[in-house]
């Protein structure tokens, strides 16, 4: 049984109040279904206008896997901050670890990535999450990420 939803929809304005990231490195558009078990889903709409496509790759644009991992981490940051504070109170989030990372399918312009993140551990200000990046119901990447929240 899924845990109750705490925040149904976190829009871009709330994300901007929560995370320090800005263009071109803000890699989520919204976060939905933040649950009491510290899980949630980040959403990234991939367009041809992404700065990374200028060099990755001009003739056949593929969204870089490392940016998907960063999108997972940003989603986890929003979930962690809002779970701790109950609001979008801004906090610095530092990436600590990436484990068990796998890239399974390319992500192309026009795709919508959903970052399904679930907390797998917490110690004081450090959090660990498992994430699956999903496009059209198929897993395109997965990883375990760790981060630290600071004031």
Curated annotation (Swiss-Prot):
Active site: 56
UniProt keyword terms in alphabetical order: Cytoplasm, Lipid A biosynthesis, Lipid biosynthesis, Lipid metabolism, Lyase
Alphabetical list of InterPro entries matching this protein: FabA_FabZ (IPR013114), FabZ (IPR010084), HotDog_dom_sf (IPR029069)
MF-aspect GO terms: (3R)-hydroxyacyl-[acyl-carrier-protein] dehydratase activity
Cytoplasm in keyword set: yes
Compartment(s): Cytoplasm
Cellular component terms per the entry's GO annotation: cytoplasm; membrane
Gene3D superfamilies registered for this protein in UniProt: Hotdog Thioesterase
Any single biological process term in GO: lipid A biosynthetic process
EC class: lyase
Catalytic activity annotation: a (3R)-hydroxyacyl-[ACP] = a (2E)-enoyl-[ACP] + H2O
EC numbers: 4.2.1.59
Protein's job: Involved in unsaturated fatty acids biosynthesis. Catalyzes the dehydration of short chain beta-hydroxyacyl-ACPs and long chain saturated and unsaturated beta-hydroxyacyl-ACPs.
PANTHER family reported in the protein's UniProt record: 3-HYDROXYACYL-[ACYL-CARRIER-PROTEIN] DEHYDRATASE
Similarity-based family: Belongs to the thioester dehydratase family. FabZ subfamily.
Official protein name in the record: 3-hydroxyacyl-[acyl-carrier-protein] dehydratase FabZ
GN (gene name): fabZ
């Amino acid at each position: 049984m899924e845990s109750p939803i705490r925040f149904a929809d976190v829009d871009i304005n709330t994300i901007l109040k929560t995370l320090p990231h800005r263009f071109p490195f803000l890699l989520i558009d919204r976060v939905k279904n933040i649950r009491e078990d510290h899980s949630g889903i980040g959403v990234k709409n991939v367009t041809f206008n992404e700065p990374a496509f200028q060099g990755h790759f001009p003739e056949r644009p593929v969204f870089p896997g490392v940016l998907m991992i960063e999108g997972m981490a940003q989603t986890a940051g929003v979930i962690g901050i809002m779970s701790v504070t109950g609001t979008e109170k801004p906090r610095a989030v530092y990436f600590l670890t990436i484990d068990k990372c796998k890239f399974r399918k390319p992500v192309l312009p026009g795709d919508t990535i959903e970052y399904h993140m679930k907390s797998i551990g917490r110690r004081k200000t450090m959090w660990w999450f498992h994430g699956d990046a999903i496009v059209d119901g198929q897993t395109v990447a997965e990883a375990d990420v760790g981060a630290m929240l600071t004031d």
